[in-house]
Amino acid sequence: MTQSTEDTLLRLAAVIDSRKGGDPDQSYVSRLFHKGDDAVLKKIGEEATEVVLAAKDVRQGGAPTALVGEVADLWFHCLVMLSHFDLSPADVIAELERREGLSGIEEKALRKRREREENGG
């Protein structure tokens, strides 16, 4: 990820964070925060479904720009969700950096081992 990409995510996250205490009648993000966990999480599910459908459309000759737009919507709502749970893009970036260089199989095995250790097993 380039520094400018990370900066974009962090700037957007800062705007989203600033909406936490905002007027739900004046801000879509404030409205989502005000509605609580279920509304935020439902929106993630809706946007993820739209990404899947747009990806399938691309395979059928649909516009790739539609897929990009849907992924942007999903990423935006993921940023809202992270903020709602007092997390930030930096937390996700740190986790991706931690995983970098590990195969998916290695990462999954390490995660399972860590979970067993945390659960006393």
UniProtKB/Swiss-Prot annotation:
Pathway membership: Amino-acid biosynthesis; L-histidine biosynthesis; L-histidine from 5-phospho-alpha-D-ribose 1-diphosphate: step 2/9
InterPro entries: HisE (IPR008179), PRib-ATP_PPHydrolase-like (IPR021130)
Keywords: Amino-acid biosynthesis, ATP-binding, Cytoplasm, Histidine biosynthesis, Hydrolase, Nucleotide-binding
Swiss-Prot/TrEMBL GO biological process terms: L-histidine biosynthetic process
Name the record gives this protein: Phosphoribosyl-ATP pyrophosphatase
GO molecular function, one term: ATP binding
Domain of life: Bacteria
Chief location: cytoplasm
Naturally occurring in which organism (per UniProt): Burkholderia orbicola (strain MC0-3)
Family label: Belongs to the PRA-PH family.
Localisation per UniProt entry: Cytoplasm
Gene3D superfamilies: MazG-like
UniProt cross-references to Pfam families, sorted A to Z: PRA-PH
